[in-house]
Design a protein with these regions (language model features):
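A Rossmann-like FAD-binding core segment of flavoenzymes
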Residues: 109-112, 116-124, 130, 189-289, ...
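Glycine-rich flavin
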Residues: 2-5, 12, 21-28, 33-166, ...
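Flexible, glycine-rich terminal cap/loop adjacent to redox cofactors
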Residues: 8-36, 41, 48, 52-62, ...
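Residues forming the flavin
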Residues: 2-3, 8-12, 18, 26, ...
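FAD-site-proximal beta/loop scaffold in flavoenzymes
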Residues: 152-168, 251-328
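Glycine-rich dinucleotide-binding loop and its adjacent helix/turn
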Residues: 47, 139-192, 196, 224-225, ...
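Hydrophobic/aromatic ligand-binding patch that stacks against planar heteroaromatic rings
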Residues: 18, 22-23, 42, 135, ...
């Protein structure tokens, strides 16, 4: 007999779990379908393990770059990769257990398997059919790969988290935040690291101050940056090393090559055609502001929609969807404007709102006023490895409403959240001026700019 649910989520990542738990809290009979581990990309091969590895890199940098000038004897140079991976795995296992406990508490049926649509109300999982009044597609995304000879010799971000040891020489190909973060982690852990970007700099969509400062730090501390670098082929050598060949004739030989050129939707194996769900030319599911697809009763959230591909965005959209469907809030939806973003690079980056070029294009040069601050991060100021910290406020109109906040430097990843609230609420430069600074911190620069 076919089992029927009020609500089914396909995909046990951040968006699916958040939405299904919220629906179950309102008394809905719910099921979550996931073929792999709970938590999706973020918990298993994304945000969480990446942050753990980033912390390890920061510890090494603290010891070797900054320790001597703080008076510490840093001659001991031992690092055990297996210990780090075991600690990371144990932490992720605890997150899995937490998810299982919450889903169990909410009486959500967790079905392990791959789901395929039979029709708009019916799914097939493990050879059995189940039906639902409402179905959420939250299948996420996966890494993209270039179409060049030898592409199979490289790994992607998923493969990085499966490495049995830290390679001595690594090439990371890509110019987005994933490439920048991975290259920073690997470089920080002590490997000879190369970052290959197609144009003049990484993170070109960020405010120019951000990308320019990042390049400055990379040139001083690594990874080695290769600009205008378009991959042509990868050759596997007799000794097992890999040679990345570029279109302009340059090449680099490494022990490990990581593709980090972007991500694509994971929508192609769930038989969307049987349900009639529309996708765009890139394979992303087309949704409106309420996360509705073109088929009544079928919804989508997260990376498979091509919206802002961040874990908190999928979580927020999923919860709001359940509020709308099951808690009598017919207009509930996520506002996708002014979403804060952090890049856990070395140093970290924080940004929310419009870049300076975007503001000038939208409002005109005469309506835009920019405030900046540039200084040496105090953490590094007493050492020979001094690192810049740069901040910017983008303001518009006579009232100087703040429409953009950007920063790069120590602590930026942790300080941005509160400032994002202020921007979302419509804060002005005067509001910032009227706020007493906390000293000595980097954050105080945002409220003391002149």
């Amino acid at each position: 007999m076919t089992k029927h649910y009020d609500y089914i989520a396909i995909g046990g990542g951040s968006g699916g779990i958040a939405s299904i738990n919220r629906a179950a809290m309102y008394g809905q009979k719910c099921a979550l379908i996931e073929a792999k581990e709970l938590g999706g990309t973020c918990v298993n091969v994304g945000c969480v393990p990446k942050k753990v590895m980033g912390h390890a890199a920061q510890i090494r940098e603290a010891i070797h770059m900054y320790g001597p000038d703080y008076g510490f004897d840093t001659t001991i140079n031992k690092f055990n990769w297996e210990t780090l991976i075991a600690s990371r795995t144990a932490y992720i296992d605890r997150i899995h257990t937490s998810y299982e406990n919450v889903l169990g508490k909410n009486n959500v049926d967790v079905i392990k398997g791959f789901a395929r649509f039979v029709d708009a109300k019916t799914l097939e999982v493990n050879g059995e059919t189940i039906t639902a009044d409402h179905i959420l597609i939250a299948t996420g995304g996966r890494p993209s790969h270039p179409d060049i000879p030898g592409v199979e010799y490289g790994i992607d971000s998923d493969g990085f988290f499966a490495l049995p040891a830290l390679p001595e020489r690594v090439a990371v190909v890509g110019a987005g935040y994933i490439a920048v973060e991975l290259a920073g982690v690997i470089n920080g852990l002590g490997a000879k690291t190369h970052l290959f970007v197609r144009k003049h700099a990484p993170l070109r969509s960020f405010d120019p101050m951000i990308s320019e400062t990042l390049v400055e730090v990379m040139n001083a501390e690594g990874p080695q940056l290769h600009t205008n670098a378009i991959p042509k082929a990868v050759v596997k050598n007799a000794d097992g090393s890999l040679t990345l060949e570029l279109e302009d004739g340059r090449s680099e030989t490494v022990d490990c090559l990581i593709w980090a050129i972007g991500r694509e939707p994971a929508n192609d194996n769930i038989n969307l055609e049987a349900a009639g769900v529309k996708t765009n030319e890139k394979g992303y599911i087309v949704v409106d502001k309420y996360q509705n697809t073109n088929i009544e009763g079928i919804y989508a959230v997260g990376d498979n929609t091509g919206a802002v591909e961040l874990t908190p965005v999928a979580v927020a959209a999923g919860r709001r969807l359940s509020e709308r469907l099951f808690n009598n809030k017919p207009d509930e939806h996520l506002d996708y404007s002014n979403i804060p973003t952090v890049v856990f690079s070395h140093p970290p980056i924080g940004t929310v709102g419009l870049t300076e070029p975007q503001a000038r294009e939208q409002y005109g040069d005469d309506q835009v006023k920019v405030y900046k601050s540039s200084f040496t991060a105090m953490y590094t100021a007493v050492t020979t490895h001094r690192q810049p910290c740069r901040m910017k406020l983008v303001c518009v109109g006579s009232e100087e409403k703040i429409v953009g906040i950007h920063g790069i430097g120590f602590g930026m990843d942790e300080m941005l959240q509160g400032f994002a609230v202020a921007l979302k609420m419509g804060a002005t430069k005067k509001d910032f001026d009227n706020t007493v600074a906390i000293h000595p911190t980097a954050a105080e620069e945002f409220v003391t700019m002149r």
